[in-house]
Amino acid sequence: MEKSWFNLMFSKGELEYRGELSKAMDSFAPSEKTTLSQDRFIYDMDKNFYGWGERSSYSTNVDLLVSSKDIRNFISDDTFFVRDGNKNSYSIYFDIKKKKFEIDNDLSDLEFFFYSYCSSSYLNNRLKGDNDLHYDPYIKDTKYNCTNHINSCIDSYFRSHICIDSNFLSDSNNSNESYIYNFICSESGKIRESKNYKIRTNRNRSNLMSSKDFDITQNYNQLWIQCDNCYGLMYKKVKMNVCEQCGHYLKMSSSERIELSIDPGTWNPMDEDMVSADPIKFHSREEPYKNRIDSAQKTTGLTDAVQTGTGQLNGIPVALGVMDFKFLGGSMGSVVGEKITRLIEYATNQRLPLILVCSSGGARMQEGSLSLMQMAKISSVLCDYQSSKKLFYISILTSPTTGGVTASFGMLGDIIIAEPYAYIAFAGKRVIEQTLKKAVPEGSQAAESLLRKGLLDAIVPRNPLKGVLSELFQLHAFFPLKKNEIK
């Protein structure tokens, strides 16, 4: 099996375990430092052995040695070997699934690793005249950039993937001061010979990406999500798909939004069995419309691009419709229009407040004029709901909201709320520029710009959104059910 070896040294401060794990993990008590016997040895880059009582020429604070297939597997390993400046040695064990964090001085499980490390062909074949600890024949002129990149990757991963306080990894607040000293590459050299790596910089943060194996969250994709702006990792439920590093708002599925807004156990879906029947027999050379529908249904688990139903929001009965951009771009076809229409009619009869969460690319072209007529149909029942029955409708615009949805029920709310940085427009930037042959000003179609021009009532982040909706409903005389009213 091919292995890569990483020799990492913390350059700032001694390793301390302060028990300051994030609330996302269980609480742990600090572990005391333990000392090993003097007969243990570590093998350095110049193939010299040092006992724990001896002083290493390159180990001033903490040495950490691990074996893995590549950097993504390295940061997913369970056990790490650490030695601090006082020559105290530790075996640090992480178990993400079981939420375990242990520090132990029994390194018997790692003996095989050290034997393998000492006999590594990469180390044994290293040039004897090379005394530069930073030297790497494959990285060459980019060696320090790659080192800084690896530092950034590991720092980002540990903070988000294991939720460790930043003080656990470094005592320095300067992001430019690296806590990793050196990075040794694979003995086969395949990693450097590959041309599938590139450096992408965003917000002064470098990220090393592989076109073959980029997603490091594969094993925990039900818990973690990767920012498509800065490529940082975050815990889905705690952060609500908002990147804690750059503040970027990631897309949420309709099911995630329902879970965010509706009280647990109160959601009652409507018209789940309604599916599109390809009413105009749309012909496409690339992929038939029915095949695209079937593929989207398998991918998302939905029957179409909207979920509708009733539930309780902080105890207040509401009618809710949530569009899902992952289903054919959230496009509005006959099924989407019919489900929203039925939801509004039900809310009218039951006198329920209405919430519609918009995320759509517009009308579905595969259904022709049938998709366009949904705009008028929904607007008509909304007129009866709002004007005749005097009921309360809140429209929530998320990124992106464009086309027919913007031109109809998206902008008809009694209160129109948008998420921060949401892209809201009728025609997209590319369409406008191609049609008018003029550049669209940057940010002119963002929620903040629309708020300044009076097209929105408020921009509300995801975290306080549920509370804001609850207050708005109570302001309009919709109150939580009493205990004896809950069926």
Curated annotation (Swiss-Prot):
The keyword rRNA processing does not apply. SUPFAM superfamilies: ClpP/crotonase. Signal peptide: none annotated. GO terms for molecular function: acetyl-CoA carboxylase activity; ATP binding; carboxyl- or carbamoyltransferase activity; zinc ion binding. Binds 1 zinc ion per subunit. InterPro entries: AcCoA_carboxyl_beta, Acetyl_CoA_COase_Trfase_b_su, ClpP/crotonase-like_dom_sf, COA_CT_N. Its EC number is 2.1.3.15. Its main location: plastid. GO terms for biological process: fatty acid biosynthetic process; malonyl-CoA biosynthetic process. A zinc finger (C4-type) spans 227-246. Residues 223-487 form the CoA carboxyltransferase N-terminal domain. Zn(2+) binds at C227, C230, C243, C246. Keywords: ATP-binding, Chloroplast, Fatty acid biosynthesis, Fatty acid metabolism, Lipid biosynthesis, Lipid metabolism, Metal-binding, Nucleotide-binding, Plastid, Transferase, Zinc, Zinc-finger. GO terms for cellular component: acetyl-CoA carboxylase complex; chloroplast stroma. Pfam families: Carboxyl_trans (PF01039). NCBIfam families: accD (TIGR00515). Belongs to the AccD/PCCB family. This is Acetyl-coenzyme A carboxylase carboxyl transferase subunit beta, chloroplastic. It comes from Lepidium virginicum.
